[in-house]
Amino acid sequence: TNFLFSNYLTNFEVGMKIVLINYSVTPMMTAIAKRLEELGHQAIIATATGDVEGSRRMADLKIGNSVDRAVHNALAWLSDTHGMHSTRVTASLLDRIIALNPDVVHLAGLNNSFINIPFMAYVLMRCKMPVALSVTEGTIPGTGRKSLIKRDRFRRRTMESTFGAWDLLHLVCNSKHTAERAAEEGLDGHPTYIISTDDTAKAVEQYITLYDNIK
């Protein structure tokens, strides 16, 4: 895997449109959205649960509801298929994303069971939309979730095939160690960037530089 380090802000074209997706709004997402708007760009936040303490911003798009999430969690716990349900919810979200036609889709977190990852990957690939996926060691898709029936080989094979075929995917890790762990879990073969979240202001500028470079 090639690790690319982005440490400066370039001159941006006016009018980037960025969709940020996560289970809930985070302070980092809020900071990115605020900075994008200061630069004359558009930020659309899509989450399952809306606002969280410290974010100071509500989601622009709501992803499913508590019943959808409960069903997803129950099915995933029974069959070790976290991130492989909520097809209807994911289709609804994708319809709205396609209508928005963003320059970049930023998946700020996929560790909670609220969307269908393989389905989302397939549609975004077909639409040829650049995607940035942020991961930490504890939020690598397909890892760290408990289930009644463990199906390690099936889960790993599904995630490897999903991410292996995902064209225009850019992986953003908070450390080189996380990048190495992600590669071990089948997320290798994509441009990989290291953006530490220790300094929020610096991370925001690096993310916006990344959007401009991959759009």
Language-model regions, residue ranges each:
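Membrane-proximal helix-turn-helix segments that form the acceptor-binding/catalytic region
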Residues: 122-126, 138-139, 151-171
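A conserved catalytic-core segment of Leloir-type glycosyltransferases
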Residues: 38, 45-104
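Active-site proximal beta-strand in glycosyltransferases
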Residues: 104-106, 121-144, 172
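Helix-loop-beta element that forms the nucleotide-linked donor phosphate-binding surface
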Residues: 179-197
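C-terminal alpha-helical cap of glycosyltransferases
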Residues: 199-215
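Short N-terminal targeting/anchoring amphipathic segment
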Residues: 20, 94-115, 130-134
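N-terminal subdomain of nucleotide-sugar transferases
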Residues: 4-59, 126-129, 166, 174, ...
